[in-house]
């Protein structure tokens, strides 16, 4: 990408995304002139311009709640659950969602604006006390969750496959128990566990099972208790061990297929949290495009198209979806007298009236009057997959203020 274009996109992003906040004044006039001169000069930037660009990228990353620019590993796998959740959250057309079997989790998302996914630390599977008597212990590293985020709920998702040639129907029931590990090893060599959730399932269905592990995750994150992990126990109710646990994908060793299958079938911990900013992840309905009358050289205040392509700022390697979005912007005159369609305030009307007789008083400005949110699916600095709701990212209406 041309360096000048990249700089221009960063400045446009800062103006559009941060406009209307105190950040808008972070670009001094001298800096604007310097950047413009560099762009017009063929794209070669001075050290001062490079520093300015870095400062703006840092500002934008802070707005996204990131300490530094993510540098994702090529081995990172985005769980299908997170992709499907993003698609459901982003209000895609119904006919485009036919391949999604899951239902939108209305209750967990109603109290959260952030969803994070975690895989267990596989290198800890061989530690003492990790597997005993059919119990599998899983340790999840939750250190990437910011301290300002409050966990509202959490679930452990396990994938299970149908057994085609299993036992008779009345012998095909299993119980799955999920425990919080209180002590990994005691004096007698056993784990001390606390039951979190349990369910009886039958082997004739292939699907994901979700278990509530909120109490444990809240203790680890809010109460700062030691995280010894979770334990999973699969019990055949008829004590038949031939198929016991083989269809529940809780360990790579139980999966005869390729590693590519394991990456999408392995246990998945999902946390729902809120950072205190903005609204929860309420599922949005698809908006109908606004019909605007064609205007001939209309210079009045109105909304204009502005598509932000994340590849233009080099962020497409860590932003999974969307590839970009229509941000829009407001531009145009606020002439006297202000017409009703210019969505003006009483103060703007008075200011425009005074300007008509005293030019030292500025006119009312064309600014966003209504903004909406977008959802972003991305990889954070720790290679964790995050779905987050960002407020005031799209201009829905303009007016003279």
From Swiss-Prot:
CDD domains: TGF_beta_BMP4_BMP2B (cd19391). Residues 1-19 form the signal peptide. It is found in: Secreted, Extracellular space, Extracellular matrix. Keywords: Chondrogenesis, Cleavage on pair of basic residues, Cytokine, Developmental protein, Differentiation, Disulfide bond, Extracellular matrix, Glycoprotein, Growth factor, Osteogenesis, Secreted, Signal. The gene is bmp4. GO terms for molecular function: cytokine activity; growth factor activity. Disulfide bonds join 301-366, 330-398, 334-400. This is Bone morphogenetic protein 4. Residues 280-299 have a biased composition (Basic residues). Residues 20-287 form a propeptide. Residues 279-299 are annotated as: Disordered. Homodimer; disulfide-linked. Forms heterodimers with the TGF-beta family member derriere. Part of a complex consisting of twsg1 and chrd. Interacts with tsku. One of its GO terms (biological process) is ossification. One of its GO terms (cellular component) is extracellular space.
């Amino acid at each position: 990408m041309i360096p000048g274009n990249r700089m221009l996109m960063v400045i446009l992003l800062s103006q559009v995304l941060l406009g209307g906040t105190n950040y808008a004044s972070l670009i001094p006039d001298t800096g604007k002139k310097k950047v413009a001169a560099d762009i017009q000069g063929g794209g070669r930037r001075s050290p001062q311009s490079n520093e300015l660009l870095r400062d703006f990228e840092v500002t934008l990353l802070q707005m996204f709640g990131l300490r530094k620019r993510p540098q994702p590993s090529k081995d990172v796998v985005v769980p299908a659950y997170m992709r499907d959740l993003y698609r459901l959250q982003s209000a895609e057309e119904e006919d485009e969602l036919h391949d999604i079997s899951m239902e939108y989790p209305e209750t967990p998302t109603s109290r959260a604006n952030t969803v994070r996914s975690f895989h267990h630390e596989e290198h800890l599977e061989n530690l003492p006390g990790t597997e005993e008597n059919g119990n599998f212990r899983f340790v999840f590293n939750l250190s990437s969750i910011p301290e300002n985020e409050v966990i509202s709920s959490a679930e452990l998702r396990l994938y299970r496959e149908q057994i085609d040639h299993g036992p008779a129907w009345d012998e095909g029931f299993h119980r799955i128990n999920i425990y919080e590990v209180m002590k990994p090893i005691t004096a007698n060599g056993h784990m001390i566990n606390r039951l979190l959730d349990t369910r009886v399932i039958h082997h004739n269905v292939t699907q994901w099972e979700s278990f509530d592990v909120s109490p444990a995750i809240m203790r680890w994150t809010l109460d700062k208790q030691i995280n010894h992990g979770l334990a999973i126990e699969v019990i055949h109710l008829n004590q038949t061990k031939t198929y016991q646990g083989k269809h529940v994908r809780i360990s790579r060793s139980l999966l005869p297929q390729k590693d590519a299958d394991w990456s999408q079938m392995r246990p998945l911990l999902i946390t729902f949290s809120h950072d205190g900013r903005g609204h929860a992840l309420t599922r949005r309905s698809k908006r109908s495009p606004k019909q605007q009358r064609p205007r001939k050289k209309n210079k009045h205040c109105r909304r204009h198209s502005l598509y932000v392509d994340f590849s233009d700022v080099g962020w497409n390697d860590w932003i999974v979806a969307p590839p970009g979005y229509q941000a829009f912007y407001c531009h145009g005159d606020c002439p006297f007298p202000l017409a009703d369609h210019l969505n003006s305030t009483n103060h703007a009307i008075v200011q425009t009236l005074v300007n008509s007789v005293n030019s030292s008083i500025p006119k009312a400005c064309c600014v966003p009057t209504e903004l909406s949110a977008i959802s972003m699916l991305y990889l954070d600095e720790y290679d964790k997959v995050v779905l987050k709701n960002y407020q005031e990212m799209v201009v829905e209406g303009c007016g003279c203020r």
